């Protein structure tokens, strides 16, 4: 553009036109401190072709009295039409660049200086930055177009100039003297490469200092994936299986890699930080973080895998935001391919998301590429985040772990255990989830809808509500090597080839998933909404007098302070009255005043929604509620009998709620809770007997409300066992029993007015049946029909009559005996 007088004339006009809008300055007055030898010719090196960058450079050179880059210059007999060159060639319209080869101007300069000993040329590397540094920029709109490490096309460059041109900065760097390089006598080609390398490293380091480091591995990693031995073998197998040329199968593997891989950019991280800072402090009342210091202590020297619970779509962004704000590297986040939507998907990818398909079944090439991608992340030490629950919990409970990602992680660690892997559980608790109303529909039986970009905008309609606070608790880390030492001693001595899949792997993976789930529950953040939901949903009319509700909340807080669930569990600040006022301000409870005071209650919509928040902390109260349940139908009970019944029910509660204690630890915890219940007046101890309060007393009401928090869970257990016993030995398959349990639960919920749709959640019944099989209480014959041990009758009647009222047991037995399921038992 500037190689002839006419071109220079046109260029001058364009520069003046550009500066009608653009304003530029040099960084740290770098143009004034170059220490140039004015007797030697000066050339300018720009990192990549951009006419706007050249115009800004020419403008700043004119301001500083430096030689202009667009004017001719001579080096001995060599006459150059302009005093600048680009280190990389011009990109095409798609933004693609061929970085091979050296700039012709540099080739000629090295030749001229080499051939004429008295000559030298000074090359000044110049970098032009559009807009402020990402760390200083506060406008999310401007951050979208800020300088990044990605190669950009002309359209984006135009938008960058228009949006960021008022704050353009130029960095002049110390000149490189070609004479000094030539004096190394490395020959022409090596000297040219040396000069290129010097400038390339310089530009990279300067850019990292100004806009942040290049944290994207996408451009190099994806191509490297197809050269891994496991992927090469999968490519060859794919080509043979599908009768494809090898090149086509390799191209397919590359497409899979690009579909999967994240594309981290510092500017995207800063953009998300700015937007999310507004979001958490305007939509929510901020974020309360606990125990992050332990992560800061273990992150150096470890491959950290964050395993949060999954409650909302914004979980994907929340943890990355918090880690970035606390000086930790944001992780690469596993996201479902359904989130790879227009606009949103690209932003998530640049924020660190990598995308995975819901199933790998029937696609071994995709499986090989994905496994190798994760293995590369782990071995290179990139932090990773994935959700062991798989999808978002619609009920507020911890879902049963999906072990696919854990299995991939375990196999990767067995391949290479040089970098120690540590899992960091992260509990995320919301006082109100953004998708609450969507979950409400699904809780009421609506089918789960596929995510759409429009869902993002639907949420904005609810943003006038108050969403309260977000709580993030970092749980106890799980060191993978130590876990394997416990599960499989001697694993280090086994042959861990790339295809190594030992017999014990599946069982170890399942136990790892359960361990992660337990550690997540241990880190629960109990908030005011959880406790108010727990109290009101335990009443028969979903209502309490304000003074009574205050007493219940004060009791729960006192119990939890006396017997903490775990060192990582956190409690809300304030007393019961403060908790009520907080929940009232969020419009989650309705109220009615009369002459005697204020009654707080749950209306129909909030009653279902509040089951979600109750379920968040149901595991915290499971054991004290179970102990309280034994005193609803018995006025007194011995410590021995209490222990016997708790031990009988505990395996099923532990499996459903991921309770933290082993059977060996249970007696000690039972004693701690009995002491607390006695001190709070809910029980009285008489030697080895524990006695309930008088049925007319306030303490008995409190004991009853505590017991009711676990009643629905115990009802489901009794339903399943009653149906099985009434059907007889080897009459029902597990699937048929599940279906009957769901129908029975739906009928009972109508008869008893239960407003809790998860009461007839099929997955809860399925898991209970699986636990009965694991405990040896049930067994399946060759046809899949279920037989049962005598212990089932003891569990169904001996224990149930202690924790469920006679009326409730009778109602369940009647439905079980007179069921009209439309199916003959013999055909099930």
Curated annotation (Swiss-Prot):
Entry's Gene Ontology molecular function annotations: glycerol-3-phosphate O-acyltransferase activity
Root EC class: transferase
CDD domains, sorted: LPLAT_DHAPAT-like (cd07993)
Coiled coil: none
Topological category with respect to the lipid bilayer: Peripheral membrane protein
GO BP: CDP-diacylglycerol biosynthetic process; fatty acid metabolic process
Pfam families the UniProt entry points to: Acyltransferase (PF01553), GPAT_C (PF19277)
InterPro entries in the record: GPAT/DHAPAT, GPAT/DHAPAT_C, GPAT/DHAPAT_LPLAT, GPAT_PlsB, Plipid/glycerol_acylTrfase
Pathway stated in the Swiss-Prot or TrEMBL entry: Phospholipid metabolism; CDP-diacylglycerol biosynthesis; CDP-diacylglycerol from sn-glycerol 3-phosphate: step 1/3
Annotated compartments: Cell inner membrane
Alphabetical keyword list: Acyltransferase, Cell inner membrane, Cell membrane, Lipid biosynthesis, Lipid metabolism, Membrane, Phospholipid biosynthesis, Phospholipid metabolism, Transferase
EC number: 2.3.1.15
Annotated GO CC locations: plasma membrane
Listed NCBIfam families: plsB (TIGR03703), PRK04974.1 (NF003441)
Name of the protein in its database record: Glycerol-3-phosphate acyltransferase
Native organism: Pseudomonas putida (strain ATCC 700007 / DSM 6899 / JCM 31910 / BCRC 17059 / LMG 24140 / F1)
């Amino acid at each position: 553009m500037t190689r002839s007088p006419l071109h220079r004339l046109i260029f001058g006009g364009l520069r003046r036109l550009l500066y009608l809008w653009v304003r530029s300055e040099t960084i740290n007055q770098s143009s004034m401190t170059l220490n140039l030898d004015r007797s030697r010719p000066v050339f300018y090196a720009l990192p990549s072709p951009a006419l706007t960058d050249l115009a800004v450079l020419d403008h700043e050179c004119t301001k500083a009295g430096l030689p202009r880059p667009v004017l001719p210059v001579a080096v001995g007999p060599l006459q150059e039409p302009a005093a600048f060159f680009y280190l990389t060639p011009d990109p095409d319209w798609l933004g693609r660049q061929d970085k091979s080869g050296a700039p012709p101007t540099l080739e000629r300069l090295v030749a001229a200086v080499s051939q004429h000993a008295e000559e030298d040329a000074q090359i000044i590397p110049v970098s032009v930055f559009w807009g402020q540094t990402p760390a200083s920029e506060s406008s999310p709109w401007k951050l979208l177009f800020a300088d990044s490490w990605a190669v950009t096309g002309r359209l984006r460059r135009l938008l960058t100039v228009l949006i960021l041109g008022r704050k353009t900065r130029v960095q002049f760097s110390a000149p490189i003297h070609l004479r000094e390089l030539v004096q190394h006598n490395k020959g022409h080609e090596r000297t040219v490469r040396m000069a290129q390398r010097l400038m390339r490293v310089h530009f990279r380091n300067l850019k990292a200092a100004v806009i942040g480091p290049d944290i994207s591995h996408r451009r190099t990693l994806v191509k490297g994936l197809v050269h891994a031995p496991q992927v090469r073998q999968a490519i060859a197998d794919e080509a043979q299986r599908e009768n494809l040329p090898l090149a086509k199968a390799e191209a397919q593997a590359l497409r899979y890699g690009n579909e999967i891989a994240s594309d981290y950019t510092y500017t995207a991280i800063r953009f998300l930080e700015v937007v999310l800072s507004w979001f958490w402090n305007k939509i929510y009342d901020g974020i309360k973080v606990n125990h992050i210091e332990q992560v800061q202590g273990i992150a150096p020297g470890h491959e950290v895998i964050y395993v949060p619970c999954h409650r909302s779509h914004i979980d994907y962004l929340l943890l990355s935001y918090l880690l970035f704000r606390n000086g930790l590297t944001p992780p690469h986040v596993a996201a479902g391919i359904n989130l790879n939507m227009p606009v949103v998907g690209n932003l998530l990818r640049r924020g660190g998301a990598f995308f995975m398909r819901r199933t790998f079944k029937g696609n071994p090439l995709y499986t090989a590429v994905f496994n190798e991608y994760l293995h590369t992340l782990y071995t290179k030490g990139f932090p990773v985040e994935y959700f062991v629950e798989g999808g978002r919990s619609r009920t507020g409970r911890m879902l049963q772990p999906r072990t696919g990602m854990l299995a991939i992680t375990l196999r990767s660690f067995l391949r290479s255990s040089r970098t120690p892997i540590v899992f960091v559980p992260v509990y995320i608790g919301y006082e109100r989830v953004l998708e609450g109303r969507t979950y409400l529909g699904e809780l009421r039986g609506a089918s789960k809808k596929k995510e759409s970009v429009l869902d993002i905008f639907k949420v904005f309609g609810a943003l006038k509500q108050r969403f309260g606070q977000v709580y993030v608790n970092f749980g106890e880390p799980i060191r993978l090597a130590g876990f394997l030492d416990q599960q499989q001693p001697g694993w280090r001595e086994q042959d861990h080839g790339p295809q190594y899949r030992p017999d014990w792997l599946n069982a170890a993976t399942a136990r790892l998933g359960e361990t992660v789930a337990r550690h997540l529950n241990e880190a629960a953040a109990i908030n005011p909404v959880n406790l108010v939901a727990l109290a009101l949903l335990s009443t028969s009319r979903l209502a309490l007098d304000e003074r009574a509700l205050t007493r219940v909340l004060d009791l729960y807080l006192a119990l939890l302070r006396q017997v903490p669930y775990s060192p990582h569990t956190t409690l809300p600040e304030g007393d019961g009255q403060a908790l009520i006022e907080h929940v009232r301000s969020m419009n989650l409870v309705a109220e009615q005043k009369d002459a005697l005071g204020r009654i707080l209650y749950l209306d129909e919509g909030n009653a279902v929604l509040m089951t979600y928040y109750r379920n968040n902390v149901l595991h915290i109260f499971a054991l004290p509620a179970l102990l309280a349940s034994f005193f609803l139908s018995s006025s007194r009970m011995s410590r021995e009998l209490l222990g016997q019944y708790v031990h009988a029910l505990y395996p099923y509660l532990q499996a459903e709620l991921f309770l933290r204690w082993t059977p060996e630890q249970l007696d000690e915890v039972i004693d701690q809770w009995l002491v607390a219940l006695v001190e709070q007046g809910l029980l009285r101890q008489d030697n080895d007997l524990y006695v309930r309060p008088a049925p007319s007393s306030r303490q008995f009401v409190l004991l009853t409300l505590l017991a009711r928090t676990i009643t629905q869970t115990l009802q489901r257990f009794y339903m399943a066992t009653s149906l099985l016993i009434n059907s007889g030995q080897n009459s029902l398959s597990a699937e048929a029993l599940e279906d009957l349990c769901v129908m029975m639960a739906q009928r009972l919920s109508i008869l008893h007015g239960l407003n809790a749709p998860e009461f007839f959640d099929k997955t809860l019944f399925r898991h209970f049946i699986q636990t009965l099989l694991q405990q040896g209480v049930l067994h399946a014959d060759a046809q899949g029909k279920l037989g049962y041990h005598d212990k089932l009758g003891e569990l169904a009647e001996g224990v149930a009559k202690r924790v469920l009222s006679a009326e409730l047991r009778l109602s369940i037995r009647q439905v079980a005996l007179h069921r009209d399921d439309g199916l003959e038992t013999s055909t099930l």
